[in-house]
Amino acid sequence: MFHSLVLMACALAALSVAQGAGSARSKSLPLSLSLSVSVSSSLASASSPGAAADPTAAFTVTATAPTPASAPFAGKQLNRCRQSCYQQLSKDWHYCKDSVDCTNCCQKLVAPFELRILKAQRQESLVLTDIGWDEMIANASRQCLITWEVSGGGLIGNLLTDTARAELSLWPDTVYNIQVKCKHKLTGLMRRSIKLNVDTSQLVGTTTTTTTSKSSIQRQHLEQPVDHTDALEHSQHIRIPRPTDRVYIISALPTPSELGGVVYPAFGALAFFLALLVMFLFLRPQRKRFPLDADSADTATLIGRSSSSSRNSMDASTLHV
């Protein structure tokens, strides 16, 4: 009798564990409590009918029952939750409600990300600024749209990229608001960055200070006395560029792109004009000479007839005399 009760209790406990793994925690907890109380009461009645049930056994059973259900949740269901972080209204979203780690992961994935300035340098009348963001965001996105606009409204620029950095050409002494929007590959949802305020006057100031410090250090090194024995070594390491006439002549000449933009259209216009001239000369309508020849023939016949009539009149006059 005792062995049969023990087997029934084990079967009921296994059934409660299976039901607790498939259902929610709120439903599995009271079921395990009721089963543990019934198991403990049956064991106590079988061993000693007059003794009361030990409450510690019931609590130990309830503490160990939900542990097998939490192990699979940390594996498959957590992965499902992370896959559906972007789809908050999908069917699998209820997996994220019971895990603190998963909800934190989802909040990080949906929250706006930060931008950082990698490099800035002055080139002629522009400030070339490199900005970057997290590479994981760029890898998980199809494309990222960078938008920069002048603070207060005005000039707006856009740039598409599939990497985690971009180079922007900004005006000096201007404040810009820069923002990046990335589209996820699987879900198609847009994720935005925090707006980055960039003052190009401060960026150029930092770059110029660094360059002046470097130039001053180079001048100090050049002003130091150098021994004649080490003159060859220093000449190999330090080479000061000196401009020549050839450099100035080459810099004064136009670039190939500028030259092509002027010469090629001129040659094209000249060739088009020559083609029109040839077409006009060879395809113009020719004058008809046949009517002119007929008129000349008629005039010739008239002249011949008049001359013959004059001769006949002269012959007649001589005969009459």
Swiss-Prot record:
Membrane topology term: Single-pass type I membrane protein
Positions in the Extracellular compartment: 19-261
GO BP terms in the entry: motor neuron axon guidance
Keywords: Membrane, Signal, Transmembrane, Transmembrane helix
Phenotype of gene-disrupted mutants: Homozygotes are viable and fertile, display no obvious abnormalities in the development of the CNS, PNS or muscles. However, they exhibit highly specific defects in the innervation pattern of muscle 12, but no obvious defects in the innervation of other muscles. Both loss and gain of function mutants display altered neuromuscular specificity.
GO cellular component terms listed in the entry, alphabetical order: membrane
Subcellular location: Membrane
Membrane topology, Cytoplasmic segments: 283-321
Top-level taxon of origin: Eukaryota
Transmembrane stretches, start-end: 262-282
Signal peptide: 1-18
Physiological role: Involved in the normal targeting of ventral muscle, muscle 12, by motoneurons. May function as an axon guidance molecule involved in neuromuscular specificity.
Descriptive protein name: Transmembrane protein fend
Gene that this polypeptide is encoded by: fend
